[in-house]
A protein has these predicted regions:
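Multi-pass membrane glycosyltransferase architecture that uses lipid-linked
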Residues: 1-195, 228-368
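Periplasmic/ER-lumenal interhelical loops and adjacent helix-loop junctions
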Residues: 185-233
Length: 368
């Protein structure tokens, strides 16, 4: 890469990570040692790592072919997510399909694999297939940890409906699935398998995070270990506050809708908000947030962050671009829009899905 990917805003991780993750040849992630290099290797969860590995086998030792194989596979993931949303809410699924976030970030990284599994789990939740909800969330968490966050609102909804057995089934099936996927690799190659957790624990605050802004603009630099602990504490406190605030205004609100503020707060409080992480929010915007106005505001702000981020990276690499300050202003704008969306969700009556009743928050059920 020579910097044009930043100037033209057409960056993807797929091509450079073909080499960084050592996907040429027959190396098995976690099980075969990484060759010495200056970059991290095996830094993704099991399901994503082997998604990449399969794409590498299909494409041989050709980085360009590897990119196009991933384009096909990730497009299928996008189609699965869109199809699930169409079944849940036919009219609103078009929001996902036409979102600039999807168009720009679908091929930046492999997050759409986890998005597809999380959205399929959401469909299974509304069909009351709680065993499958857990299986799909477990698979999603084996691809990217964020789908595990859905266990909180989904189980809370079942408990609110006085169905503790379903909440337990959901949690246990998710845990069993995640363990079934991960345990063989942890047992056979613990050092390689643990690299994902080690890498993310040691990773410093990224350009897009509030922690980085505090350090860069206010000289309030927090050590990485303290950021990790503080982020968790802040997240627990903020989620609890949002939950209580919503319950005071609307005691019978659908608990599954907590998925939206939880995901937003994870992105705002965490130390990394990579561009493709915005894909996590799209299904929640489609299903939960009332009206298109705030969705359009988020899409505009996210587009501004995307363009100024890579323009700034172009400036860093010497091909020209906007200064860092413009990018940081756009970050603050997007954060403000997301906070506005969460406040609106707390203050306004909850949106009901087509056919959903206040006392029965499930689509016409298949017997579980």
């Amino acid at each position: 890469m020579d910097g044009r990917q930043y100037r033209l805003a057409c960056y993807t991780d797929i091509v450079p990570l073909f080499g960084t993750e050592q996907l040429a040849g027959g190396r098995l992630p976690y099980l075969d040692a990484c060759a010495p290099s200056g970059s991290n290797c095996d830094e993704y969860p099991v399901l994503t790592m082997y998604f990449m590995r399969v794409a590498g086998w299909i494409s041989g030792d050709h980085p360009e072919r590897f990119f196009w194989v991933n384009v096909i596979l990730l497009s299928l993931c996008a189609a699965v997510a869109a199809g699930c949303l169409y079944v849940i809410d036919t009219r609103r699924a078009i929001w996902f399909a036409l979102a600039p976030t999807l168009a720009l970030q679908v091929f930046v990284n492999w997050d759409l694999l986890a998005v597809a599994l999380a959205t399929a789990a959401t469909l299974a939740f509304f069909r009351r297939r709680d065993g499958w909800v857990g299986v799909l969330i477990g698979l999603g968490a084996a691809a990217k940890l964020y789908p595990a966050l859905l266990l909180i609102p989904f189980a809370a909804d079942r408990l609110r409906g006085r169905q503790p057995d379903r909440a337990i089934l959901l949690w246990w099936s998710a845990a069993a699935t995640w363990i079934a996927v991960n345990l063989p690799f942890a047992a056979a190659g613990l050092h390689g398998w643990w690299e994902f957790f080690r890498f993310n624990g040691a990773r410093p605050a990224d350009w897009d995070s509030a922690w980085y802004l505090l350090c860069h603009r206010l000289s309030l630099c927090v050590p990485t270990g303290l950021i990790n602990v503080s982020s968790i504490a802040l997240l627990v406190g903020l989620i609890s506050w949002v939950w209580m605030a919503k319950r005071r205004r609307e005691p019978d609100f659908p608990r599954w809708q907590l998925a939206f503020p939880i995901l937003v707060l994870v992105l705002l409080v965490g130390k990394v908000y990579s561009p493709q992480f915005s894909l996590w929010l799209l299904p929640s915007f489609v299903l939960i947030l009332p009206g298109p106005r705030r969705f359009l505001a988020f899409e505009a702000a996210d587009l501004a962050v995307f363009l100024t981020r890579f323009s700034f990276f172009g400036d860093l690499t010497g091909v020209g671009g906007l200064p860092q300050g413009v990018f940081e202003i756009m970050l603050l704008l997007r954060a403000g829009v997301l906070i506005w969306c969460v406040v609106a969700w707390v203050r306004e009556p909850s949106r009901r899905l087509p056919g959903e009743r206040a006392t029965d928050r499930a689509l016409p059920a298949a017997h579980a």
